[in-house]
């Protein structure tokens, strides 16, 4: 947790402090506990997760328990962790260890990565370990070198695109059903951003070919360097126009990338009901008619519950039927639309096949043949085993 980067628009280093790295044994043990509980997919989280590094023997021990340690600040821009060695667990080492020591975890992914410090050692581990997801979230924030410098991002557009090219050379293998999927973050309307700066951002999005991107209008945040030193001088109408234009460009690219999946049959982790299905059920059943999980979903069967974004275990006492009440039987369709993700983080919607209860599919991985494409998702049908 924490961050050492001090981007001028960001408050995280001031609110969460410097990077703190947990002992690798603690992380692996937690993954084992989750696997024993039936979890199939794990995401490692960090503000700059690829900075993870634990130097053995350098931590305080309390009651025989090794404590987390503060991460080093260093120049970065390396191809391999400069502190790698027998006394250090690097991020690449950690990924390989979880993969090898917790074989029942079917998917391991991580977010968010800092692009300048993404070494070949991590790319090699992803390539050589089949249960590591080929999905990288690598925020760019702008396609203008001038704006990147004002943001204190620490890299140029050329350095960022060099990383993308390197990542694709290691990991993009659509011919074996393992394409690399990328996502990014962008801020439009950062102080002093000109039309030329924004056009450079459009060009980067076209060049990067993200499967999705998180796009935001700049707004001053108390406690940041930007609010103290940079006037918020881009008019709101201009921010809104640029935001909408970038969203449209990304939507087109997302749909084009989705089209490359047509006719393929990726493995999909079933997370729960689709948004469309949740809305349909909400219309058909009053909020008071059934117990609700976080996100307003009433689906709890055989010890599993589907929420908005995840699958969670529940006790037998919490189980309830998803069969509609008699008064609603003609309102809800027989088919139930489920939602899940590929290992490349592409959202897939599909109907539970006849003869198979949707509840039994939650938290499983199923093959889905892709038949339709939308800007933010794809649709398909469950393939025969």
Question: What is each PLM-predicted segment?
Answer:
Residues 15, 47-49, 218, 353:
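Short, ordered loop/turn segments at secondary-structure junctions
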Residues 226-385:
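Terminal RNA-binding accessory module
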């Amino acid at each position: 947790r924490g961050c050492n980067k001090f981007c001028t628009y960001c408050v995280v280093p001031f609110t969460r402090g410097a990077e703190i790295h947990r002992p690798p044994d603690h992380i692996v043990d937690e993954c084992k506990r989750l696997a024993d509980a039936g979890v199939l997919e794990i995401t490692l989280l960090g503000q700059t997760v690829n900075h993870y590094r634990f130097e053995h023997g350098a931590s305080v021990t309390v009651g025989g328990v090794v404590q987390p340690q503060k991460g080093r600040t260093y120049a970065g821009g390396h191809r391999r962790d400069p502190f790698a060695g027998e006394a250090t667990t690097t991020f690449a080492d950690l990924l390989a260890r979880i993969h090898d020591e917790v074989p029942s975890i079917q998917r391991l992914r991580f977010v968010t990565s800092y692009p300048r410090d993404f070494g070949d050692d991590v790319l090699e581990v992803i390539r050589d370990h089949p249960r590591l997801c080929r999905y990288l979230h690598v925020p760019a924030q702008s396609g203008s070198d001038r704006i990147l410098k004002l943001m204190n991002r620490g890299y140029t557009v050329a350095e960022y695109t060099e990383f993308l090219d390197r990542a694709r050379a290691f990991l993009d293998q659509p011919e074996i059903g393992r394409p690399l999927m990328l996502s990014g973050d962008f801020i439009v309307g950062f102080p002093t951003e000109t039309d030329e700066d924004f056009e450079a951002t459009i060009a980067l999005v076209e060049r990067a070919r993200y499967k999705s991107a998180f796009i935001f209008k700049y707004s001053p945040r108390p406690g940041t360097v930007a609010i103290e030193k940079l006037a918020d001088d881009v008019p709101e109408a201009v921010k809104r126009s640029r935001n909408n234009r970038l969203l449209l460009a990304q939507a087109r690219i997302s749909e084009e990338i989705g089209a490359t999946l047509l006719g393929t049959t990726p493995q999909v982790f079933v997370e729960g009901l689709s948004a469309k299905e949740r809305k349909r059920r909400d219309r058909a059943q009053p909020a008071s008619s059934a117990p609700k999980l976080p996100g307003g979903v009433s689906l709890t069967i055989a010890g599993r519950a589907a929420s908005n974004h995840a699958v969670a275990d529940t006790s037998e006492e919490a189980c309830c039927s998803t069969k509609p009440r008699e008064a609603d039987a003609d309102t809800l369709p027989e088919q139930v639309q489920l939602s899940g993700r590929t290992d490349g983080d592409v959202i897939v919607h599909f109907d539970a096949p006849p003869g198979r209860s949707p509840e039994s599919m939650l938290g499983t991985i199923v093959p889905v043949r892709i038949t339709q494409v939308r800007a933010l998702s794809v649709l398909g049908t469950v393939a025969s085993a």
